[in-house]
C-alpha cells in the first residue's frame, strides 16, 4: 500500500501496487477474490495492450483507438463477459446492464427519456434535501471523526430510493438495501469455477444462497410496482412512474413487471453505490490536498451563500466538477470492465479469437503514462479544458451506445452534495486511517474514509 498520503507535501494519494510478475490460475483467483485490481500488471500503465492465458486467453486493452473498436465500432462483437453476467444476473436479471442485442436496444430506447435533462433536473430538490440532511448529520458528529463513506452511502441511497419509489410506503427501502448489500458481500466475488471457465449450469457456492435471499425482496418489489401501476403517478413523477409510462418508440413495447423491477434494481445499485464511492474518494482527495479544498470551498461559498446547492447551481461550480472528474480518473467505481469476444479481431497487433476475454482496466487507463502527465498525482486542473482529454482515455461512465444512461444524474447529485458540504466544513485527515482501494464489484475505500469535519 502507498505510504501515508494525508499531507500536502506528498502529492501522491493512495495507490495499489500493481502486479509485477505473472501468476498461475489458483493464485490469480485468490488475488481476484481479495481485490480485482491485483490482477492488473504494472505494464498496463505503460503498454497499449497485454495478452496472456490462465484457463482462457485474455487481453488487457489500454489504447484509446482499440477501446473505441470494442465499445463503439464493433460493440456487438464484444458483449459483456460471461463472468460479469453470472455475477450480476441473480440480482438484476436481464436488465439494461446485462442484456445484449435487440433485447438491450429496446430497453434502452424505452428508458432513455427517463433520464432526459428535464427529468433529471426535476429530481434536483431530492438531491438538495439529501445534501442538507447530510450536512446536519456531519455537524451533529461534533469533534469526532466522521466516516464519509458511510455518510455518502446513506445520502445517495436516500436519493435513489426517493426518486425511484418516492415516499409512499409501498416498499421497504431498508430491506432492498440490505438484500443488495448481502448479495454483493456473499456472492459478488469471482468463483474459481468462473476462472476455470466451467459451464454456467454448475452452481457457484454462495451465489445460490444469496440469490435465494433476493427472492422475497423481488416479490415485494413486484407488488409495489403493480400497486403503483394501479394507483397512477404522483404530482412529480419518479423513476418508476416514468418507466411505467415508457415505451419503445420503435416497437411500441413496454416493460413487464419483472423487467421494470430488474431495471429499477439496476438503477438503485448503480445510482447510489457508484456516486457514493465517487463522493467518498472526492472527500478523501480534498482532505489530502488542502489547497484544492480551499479553492473548492471558496467557489462553493461564493455561489451558495450559505444554502444547499441546487440543480441550477451545478453549471456555476466548475471546480467542484473538476474534483469529481479527477476522483473518477484515480478511483473509477468500475475499475475493470470485461468483454467476451465473439469474432476474430486485431487490437493493437493482438490476435483476438472468439471466446477470448477482453478487459479494459479503467483503473490502469486513468494512470497510463502515455495518456496522462504525472498520472498518479491529484490534479483537478487537468479537467479545466475537458476537450483536451482524449476520448476513450477517460471512461468513468463507459462510452459508445452502452454509455451509462444515468451519467448526468450521477454528476448532478455529486456536485450538489460535494459543494454543499465543502461550503460548510473543512475536512482534515485522521492520521493512520488511509483508505485502501479494493475492488470486488466496485472500487471501494476499504476501511472507510475517516475525516475530521470542522465547521467554517
Task: Locate each region found by the language model.
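Cytochrome P450 fold signature focused on the C-terminal beta-domain
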Residues: 232-237, 297-317, 330-350, 359, ...
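Residue-level recognition of short, solvent-exposed, well-ordered loop/turn junctions
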Residues: 353-354
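Conserved cytochrome P450 K-helix E-x-x-R motif and the immediately C-terminal K′/meander segment
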Residues: 26-48, 219, 223, 307-348
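Cytochrome P450 heme-thiolate monooxygenase catalytic core
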Residues: 1-18, 79-85, 103, 119-277, ...
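N-terminal membrane-proximal hinge/A-helix region immediately C-terminal to the signal-anchor transmembrane segment
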Residues: 2-106, 121, 125-133, 155, ...
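Conserved cytochrome P450 K-helix/beta-meander segment immediately N-terminal to the heme-binding cysteine loop
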Residues: 360-387
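Cytochrome P450 proximal C-terminal region
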Residues: 2-13, 44, 131-135, 152, ...
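Cytochrome P450 catalytic-core helices
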Residues: 274-293, 297-299, 408-425
Amino acid at each position: 500500500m502507498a505510504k501515508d498520503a494525508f499531507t500536502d507535501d506528498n502529492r501522491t494519494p493512495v495507490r495499489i501496487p500493481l502486479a509485477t510478475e505473472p501468476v498461475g490460475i489458483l493464485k490469480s483467483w485468490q488475488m481476484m477474490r481479495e481485490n480485482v485490481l491485483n490482477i492488473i500488471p504494472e505494464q498496463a500503465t505503460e503498454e497499449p495492450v497485454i495478452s496472456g492465458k490462465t484457463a482462457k486467453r485474455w487481453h488487457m486493452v489500454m489504447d484509446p483507438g482499440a477501446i473505441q473498436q470494442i465499445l463503439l465500432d464493433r460493440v456487438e462483437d464484444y458483449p459483456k463477459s460471461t463472468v460479469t453476467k453470472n455475477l450480476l444476473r441473480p440480482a438484476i436479471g436481464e436488465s439494461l446492464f446485462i442484456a445484449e442485442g435487440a433485447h438491450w436496444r429496446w430497453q434502452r430506447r424505452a428508458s432513455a427519456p427517463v433520464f432526459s435533462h428535464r427529468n433529471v433536473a426535476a429530481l434536483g430538490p431530492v438531491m438538495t434535501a439529501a445534501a442538507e440532511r447530510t450536512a446536519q448529520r456531519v455537524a451533529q458528529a461534533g469533534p469526532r471523526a466522521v466516516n464519509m463513506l458511510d455518510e455518502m452511502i446513506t445520502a445517495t441511497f436516500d436519493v435513489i430510493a426517493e426518486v425511484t419509489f418516492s415516499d409512499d410506503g409501498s416498499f421497504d427501502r431498508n430491506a432492498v438495501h440490505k438484500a443488495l448489500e448481502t448479495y454483493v458481500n456473499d456472492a459478488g466475488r469471482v468463483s474459481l469455477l468462473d476462472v476455470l471457465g466451467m459451464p454456467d449450469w454448475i452452481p457457484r457456492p454462495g451465489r445460490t444462497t444469496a440469490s435465494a435471499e433476493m427472492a422475497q425482496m423481488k416479490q415485494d418489489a413486484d407488488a409495489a410496482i403493480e400497486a403503483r401501476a394501479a394507483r397512477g403517478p404522483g404530482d412529480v413523477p419518479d423513476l418508476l412512474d416514468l418507466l411505467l409510462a415508457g415505451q419503445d418508440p420503435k416497437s411500441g413495447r413496454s416493460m413487464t413487471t419483472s423487467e421494470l423491477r430488474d431495471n429499477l434494481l439496476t438503477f438503485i445499485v448503480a445510482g447510489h453505490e457508484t456516486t457514493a464511492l465517487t463522493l467518498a474518494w472526492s472527500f478523501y482527495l480534498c482532505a489530502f490536498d488542502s489547497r484544492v479544498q480551499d479553492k473548492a470551498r471558496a467557489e462553493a461559498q461564493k455561489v451558495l451563500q450559505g444554502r444547499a446547492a441546487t440543480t441550477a447551481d451545478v453549471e456555476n461550480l466548475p471546480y467542484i466538477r473538476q474534483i469529481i472528474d479527477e476522483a473518477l480518473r484515480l478511483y473509477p467505481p468500475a475499475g475493470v470492465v470485461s468483454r467476451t469476444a465473439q469474432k476474430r479481431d486485431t487490437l493493437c497487433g493482438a490476435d483476438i479469437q472468439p471466446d477470448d476475454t477482453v478487459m479494459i482496466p479503467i483503473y490502469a487507463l486513468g494512470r497510463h503514462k502515455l495518456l496522462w502527465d504525472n498520472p498518479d498525482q491529484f490534479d483537478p486542473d487537468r479537467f479545466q479544458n475537458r476537450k483536451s482529454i482524449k476520448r476513450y482515455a477517460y471512461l468513468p461512465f463507459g462510452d459508445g451506445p452502452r454509455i451509462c444512461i444515468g451519467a448526468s444524474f450521477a454528476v448532478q447529485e455529486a456536485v450538489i452534495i460535494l459543494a454543499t458540504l465543502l461550503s460548510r466544513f473543512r475536512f482534515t485527515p485522521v492520521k493512520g486511517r488511509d483508505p485502501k482501494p479494493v475492488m470486488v464489484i466496485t472500487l471501494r475505500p476499504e476501511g472507510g474514509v475517516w475525516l475530521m469535519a470542522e465547521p467554517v
